[in-house]
Amino acid sequence: MAVISMKQLLEAGVHFGHQTRRWNPKMAEYIFTDRNGIYIIDLQKTAKKLEEAYSFVRELSAQGGTILFVGTKKQAQDAIKEEAERCGMFYVNQRWLGGTLTNFKTIRKRVERLIEIEKMEQEGALSVLPKKEVAKILKEKEKLSRFLSGIKEMKKLPDALFVVDPRKEKIAVAEARKLDIPVVAIVDTNCDPDEVDYVIPGNDDAIRAVKLITSKIADAVIEGRQGEQYAE
């Protein structure tokens, strides 16, 4: 059974690349043609590359591996959060904090602070503090929560990254590469595919296209997890 159909890819507009003047020549092999100054991505290749990425994610997940979903551009934020939560994985959809991977211990301390504040709230510890102090703590919580809630349960480095637009998320990709963490990504015609281990050529600007491909990666995680359960 194919992971995705041509019809699904076409309907979501996965084939629309960027304007021809904004392109990376390394993406030439994934381009079918250009139409009215816009590159059209070869969906046969997208389907094939998505199959490869799907297999990788499924196998990783079956072995108990974890994936960090990354997409901070407006078109990706909702899909990244929804799909990561659906498959029980971690996500960053606001701003990538430099050092999230390469300085993981420090980031983890900030996460622990967030958990501590949440615990104080639950136990009613804030009610005994002066109002000014409470306001300050809640403001801190709001900021921490915004950037870190998606990685709150991530107690160690992830085994792979799934990225929407590696050009926009270049810091995340660079950190992953430095640590030899494989990167799966939706790569549009203006991106550098050499930075990515599992390239999925496609439109990274249309909400429907991003949602479709992100949901397939989440499906792969779920399928792998089911295999893991059966293997036990």
UniProtKB/Swiss-Prot annotation:
Cellular component GO terms held in the UniProt record: cytosolic small ribosomal subunit
CDD domains for the chain: RPS2
Record InterPro entries: Ribosomal_uS2, Ribosomal_uS2_bac/mit/plastid, Ribosomal_uS2_CS, Ribosomal_uS2_flav_dom_sf
Transmembrane keyword on record: no
PROSITE patterns in the cross-refs: RIBOSOMAL_S2_1 (PS00962)
Entry keyword set: Ribonucleoprotein, Ribosomal protein
Pfam entry (one): Ribosomal_S2
GO annotation, biological process: translation
SUPFAM superfamilies: Ribosomal protein S2 (SSF52313)
A molecular function GO annotation: structural constituent of ribosome
Superkingdom: Bacteria
NCBIfam families (UniProt xref): rpsB_bact
Similarity comment: Belongs to the universal ribosomal protein uS2 family.
Protein name stated in the entry: Small ribosomal subunit protein uS2
Species, as recorded: Carboxydothermus hydrogenoformans (strain ATCC BAA-161 / DSM 6008 / Z-2901)
